[in-house]
Amino acid sequence: MASIHKDISIDAPADAVWDAIADFGALHTRLAPGFVTDTQLDGDARIVTFANGAVAREILVDCDAARMRLAYAIVSERLSQHSASVQVLADGAERSRVIWTVDVLPHEIAPYMDAQMELGARAMQTRFHRHRP
């Protein structure tokens, strides 16, 4: 199984970043606009449309406000395994770090997933840099 890790520095307080991450249906407006173009809630899942045209059904596994950690999974024909977590850590009063981890199979999809996560990380940084909470 391939594990992909991103440690993302964000120019915003941890509470503000967590609030955007925990808003499960607003990925396209509050966390990663431009990278994600639409998010539709469907029960405990969200249907995410990415800027490149890809669509994924992400199932909410856990949303732990005390730990500022959200876990989700993708079930699809292309993936035999996908589990992910996003956790926010304070880095002083005005900055935070987002730890985004994805475990995925098959291994062959890992380079694509890594590149997409890098675009997502940049979108998060841009969103908070331009729109201070």
What are these language model-derived features?
Residues 45-51, 70-77, 102:
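Short beta-strand segments that buttress and anchor functional surface loops
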Residues 74-126, 133:
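Beta-strand/loop substructures that line and gate deep hydrophobic ligand-binding cavities in soluble
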